[in-house]
Amino acid sequence: MPLLKEDRYTLADALTWDKRERIELIDGAPVMMAPPFRLHQEIITALLAQLYNYLEGKKCKVYPAPFAVRLFERADDRPEDVDTMVGPDLSVVCDPGKLDDIGCKGAPDLIIEVLSPSTQCHDRLTKYNLYERAGVPEYWIVSPEERTVQVSTLVDGRYRVQELYTAEAV
């Protein structure tokens, strides 16, 4: 299957792609995601366990990648209409009405991305702006290299860095 064509891609196309490949769609353009490193997976597993335990018995649920988040999908959209689909490392969704068999329709309440060398620019710039535009209320960027967690919250439609935690503070 050729991955590049002149037209924009949609969720309908993505649903036909090899499920073993990590591919995101950003405004109709496919973005190949590199396989994560061991440390990346260890951090995600630790965060997943903490969030799962914290949210137990609450209405919010945490979902690890692969989990298709269609940030701008509306209720009446067909797969052919959806041109943006990301697979955050962790997503917290508090509205069960946003969930379907594929993943999440609309913005999750919290997205966490753990940086890898190959995704650092993508997560800090492209996804930061994308999540802000989609109205994701809270976005955490975890940097294993810097040993930091940047917590940004949406205020008047723009992200503001609320906290920058270091390994010593955690």
Ranges and model annotations:
Residues 1-170:
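Gly/Pro/Ser/Thr-rich low-complexity, intrinsically disordered segments predominantly at protein N-termini
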